[in-house]
């Protein structure tokens, strides 16, 4: 019998991670799973409220599950990533990253650009890149298999919009996924 009470999907640069939390309110059990792997197991926790902190993904991003009593024997479970609510973290992240998903050579590829460092990730691995200045901006070149790729960064000309990043694979523009 499982005491699964909460499941979250967290999109990081190295992929989307599934976090599951079991809370046995009668047994005092707390179990945290990340991508199906047990990270924390505590038995006989007589204090039913509190928090569990662990790390997610290749960058060891700090995550905390908060357990709060809301009434009687009802509990609320919230996830924080790097000290922010999951919602706030994802809103902030959407401003600092671009994500593209494409299918080629019979495989799916998830490409993430971290705009602050210009790091490029593909399916959980940080790629070797080469930056180049061009007439209207910059290009960050990399390869996926036998495919030549680059992310073009150009000014939008509007202060609010800032820089526009476009992924080009084999001279074809790839649409960004909505975050």
UniProtKB/Swiss-Prot annotation:
The modification N-acetylthreonine is found at residue 2. Keywords: Acetylation, Apoptosis, Cytoplasm. The keyword Cytoplasm applies. InterPro entries: FAIM1, FAIM1_dom_sf. GO terms for biological process: apoptotic process; negative regulation of extrinsic apoptotic signaling pathway via death domain receptors. It is found in: Cytoplasm. Plays a role as an inducible effector molecule that mediates Fas resistance produced by surface Ig engagement in B cells. Belongs to the FAIM1 family. This is Fas apoptotic inhibitory molecule 1. It comes from Homo sapiens. The gene is FAIM.
């Amino acid at each position: 019998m499982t005491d699964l009470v909460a499941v979250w999907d967290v999109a990081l640069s190295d992929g989307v991670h599934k976090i599951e939390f079991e809370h046995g309110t009668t047994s005092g059990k707390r179990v945290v799973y990340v991508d199906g792997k047990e990270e924390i197991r505590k038995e006989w926790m007589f204090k039913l409220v509190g928090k569990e902190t662990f790390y997610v993904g290749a960058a060891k991003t700090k995550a905390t599950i908060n357990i709060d009593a809301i009434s009687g024997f009802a509990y609320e479970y919230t996830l924080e990533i790097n000290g922010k609510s999951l919602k706030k973290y994802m809103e902030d992240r959407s401003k600092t990253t671009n994500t593209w998903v494409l299918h080629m050579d019979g495989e799916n590829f998830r490409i993430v650009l971290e705009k602050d460092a210009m790091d490029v990730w593909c399916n959980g691995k940080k790629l070797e890149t080469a930056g180049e200045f061009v007439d209207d901006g910059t290009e960050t070149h990399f390869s996926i298999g036998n495919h030549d790729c680059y992310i073009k960064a150009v000014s939008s000309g509007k202060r609010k919009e800032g820089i526009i990043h476009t992924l080009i694979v084999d001279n074809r523009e790839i649409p960004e996924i909505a975050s």
